[in-house]
């Protein structure tokens, strides 16, 4: 660690001359994704970046890097509705808005809100529900802006420790906050939250910080200490290493999800709510792994 006393001249010059060269550099995210559908088939299963009923996107704009995940609510399948259509369309709309520059980096809730209302105004009714988590890195300010609705989420790791994480939003056990579009005759009887209900946060990040964004299929099956163990294997900041680590994390969560004797975070949460449950939670799993790096064109 640099000593202020030892490097007083350097610090003084930086103050006198304005921002240092390090502070003036733009940041970016080196990001990779991996996931599993609940039906055991791994990889991208449907149009766009979808793993089962989960969906995600990674988008780059000159002002920011933006990524997101959404978990389609599977209960719609009982009514003949494909849950992946809602989550997939929501994420593709968010991605398009970013690429078109129709967003403000400091306002990820705005991305979610605009995308959701585009879906509401769709001429062809799109029924369904999903959770959503949006993460934005502002290149120049080096700040991360987040919006999380429901039980998907993110965590930021620095020096092997979790320094920031999203708060899970639940109405009650296993019923997360969610965006919904219901048929007119069912409006009022389908649980639906406003994008403005998303939990928002903003904070500075540093070069080398690791950002993991995922659906509940990961967090319900892997506690933080297991995730941190996998992240220790990440030695390089290139795409290949990031992709391999994302794959390793998703694969471990997938194995644990089908272990009947494993006391998963979901099982522990169920026990805390008076239910006698043990084992992993079979679910779609989506992992986006990102490393904060210096921006290059």
UniProtKB/Swiss-Prot annotation:
A molecular-function term among this protein's GO annotations: metal ion binding
Domain spans labelled PPM-type phosphatase: 28-292
GO process terms (BP): regulation of ubiquinone biosynthetic process
Record-annotated disulphide pairs: none
Sequence intervals crossing the membrane: none
UniProt-listed InterPro entries: PPM-type-like_dom_sf, PPM-type_phosphatase-like_dom, PPTC7
Residues involved in Mn(2+) 2 binding: 71, 216
EC identifiers of the protein: 3.1.3.16
Gene Ontology cellular component list: mitochondrial matrix; mitochondrion
Entry keyword set: Hydrolase, Magnesium, Manganese, Metal-binding, Mitochondrion, Protein phosphatase, Transit peptide
Pfam families membership: SpoIIE
Reaction catalyzed: O-phospho-L-seryl-[protein] + H2O = L-seryl-[protein] + phosphate; O-phospho-L-threonyl-[protein] + H2O = L-threonyl-[protein] + phosphate
Enzyme class, broadest EC rank: hydrolase
Cofactor(s) essential for the protein: Mg(2+); Mn(2+)
Cellular localization per UniProt: Mitochondrion matrix
Record: residues binding Mn(2+) 1: 71-72
UniProt key word Metal-binding: yes
Transit peptide residue numbers: 1-27
Free-text comment on the cofactor: Binds 2 magnesium or manganese ions per subunit.
Keyword Hydrolase in record: yes
Major place of residence: mitochondrion
Function of the protein: Protein phosphatase which positively regulates biosynthesis of the ubiquinone, coenzyme Q. Dephosphorylates the ubiquinone biosynthesis protein coq7 which is likely to lead to its activation.
Family according to the record: Belongs to the PP2C family.
Protein name: Protein phosphatase PTC7 homolog
